[in-house]
Amino acid sequence: MRRAVCPGSFDPITNGHLDIIVRASKLFDEVVVAVLINKSKAHLFTIEERIDLIRDAVRSHPDAPTNVVVDSSHGLLVDFCRVRGIQSIVKGLRAVSDFDYELQMAQMNHSLAGVETLFMSTNPQYAFLSSSLVKEVARYGGDVSGLVPDVVLKGLRDRSAP
């Protein structure tokens, strides 16, 4: 079975993330979305909320894949891959600046565990998009409806409600 992981903090998941996950699901038998736990980072959504948001977003996508599972991970991503028998990491690249960092990570992951990294170019309509940008725009009452799945939009609105 060809298995891949799409890692990230997904705080929150964006339409750009979702696009990469759905596209990866067409290339692999199973795609595991690994929600990375970083306790030193302040998150808007809890790990459980992020997992639920991702599951709901994938399920409600027009091309809803049935081969996507969501899990959480702390520690080294290659250890997560090794324990679960995952051979590939899928990463979306928005710009050349992403490539510099991601290439170093890919080389390290390969040297540590022989895990391959597949880079997918982001759909141009999402090239500027990041979770941080979504949170910033939403924090000031901006419209993020075209940037995140509906379930995330509801979650963001619930967070900003008085």
From Swiss-Prot:
Keyword Transit peptide: no
Function: Reversibly transfers an adenylyl group from ATP to 4'-phosphopantetheine, yielding dephospho-CoA (dPCoA) and pyrophosphate.
Keywords from the UniProt entry: ATP-binding, Coenzyme A biosynthesis, Cytoplasm, Magnesium, Nucleotide-binding, Nucleotidyltransferase, Transferase
Compartments it resides in: Cytoplasm
Main location: cytoplasm
GO terms assigned for molecular function: ATP binding; pantetheine-phosphate adenylyltransferase activity
Pathway: Cofactor biosynthesis; coenzyme A biosynthesis; CoA from (R)-pantothenate: step 4/5
Cofactor(s) of this protein: Mg(2+)
Positions bound to substrate: S9, K41, L77, K91
EC numbers for this chain: 2.7.7.3
Organism name: Parafrankia sp. (strain EAN1pec)
UniProt name for this protein: Phosphopantetheine adenylyltransferase
CDD domains: PPAT
The keyword Nucleotide-binding appears for this protein: yes
InterPro entries to which the protein is assigned, alphabetical: Cyt_trans-like, PPAT, Rossmann-like_a/b/a_fold
Pfam family, one: CTP_transf_like
Any one annotated GO CC term: cytoplasm
BP terms from Gene Ontology: coenzyme A biosynthetic process
